[in-house]
């Protein structure tokens, strides 16, 4: 059978939709997991021996880094859609740097908490905080690995207005991680 141009476009379209659907399904499962954990946090908080503590101020800096990274990721994708390879590369490198800064500030915040006596095994409130922020950081690490892969591809000139799928997948997941952190941060500020 001879494959025609419309058939090739249809195969490419089907492949794109399959990857995007799988990504969305995985993000829905992550939302369910974090919803369950935050629900558990609220239920457990109502019981005795809940230790109330202030979040380290460095979490605000973490939040700024990850929000800025969302902007640089948006810029990178917009640049790729316009075939601006320089803007794409710079946007992805900035996003990668901000992701590393977010990771560093998360570890710094955990260090502050330990100095204040908030441990994973010390109290349920500390355990929930460590699990929520730690799981987010694990997902962010996965996003950073894929971001590094996409950044390498961008440096090699692989992405342009006609080839955006890996970049789009990376962008969708990165914005999801940003939104998830914002939810967790606000939740931890409001629900003590």
Task: Describe each model-derived feature in a short phrase.
Residues 1-192:
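...captures the hydrophobic TM-helix bundle architecture rather than a specific catalytic motif
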């Amino acid at each position: 059978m001879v494959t025609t141009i419309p058939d090739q476009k249809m195969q490419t379209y089907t492949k794109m939709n399959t990857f995007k659907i799988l990504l969305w399904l995985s993000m829905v499962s992550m939302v369910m997991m974090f919803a369950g954990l935050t629900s558990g946090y609220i239920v457990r908080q109502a019981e005795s021996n809940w230790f109330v503590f202030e979040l380290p101020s460095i979490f605000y800096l973490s939040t700024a880094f990850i929000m800025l990274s969302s902007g640089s990721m948006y810029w990178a994708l917009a640049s790729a859609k316009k075939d601006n390879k320089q803007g794409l590369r710079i946007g992805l490198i900035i996003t990668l740097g901000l992701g590393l800064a977010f990771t560093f500030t998360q570890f710094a915040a955990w260090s502050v908490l330990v100095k204040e006596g908030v441990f994973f095994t010390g109290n349920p409130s500390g355990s929930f905080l460590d699990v929520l922020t730690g799981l987010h950081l694990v997902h962010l690490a996965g996003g950073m690995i894929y971001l590094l892969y996409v950044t390498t591809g961008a440096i090699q000139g692989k992405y342009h207005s006609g080839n955006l799928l890996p970049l789009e997948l990376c962008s969708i997941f990165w914005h999801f991680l940003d939104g998830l952190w914002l939810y967790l941060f606000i939740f931890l500020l409001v629900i003590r």
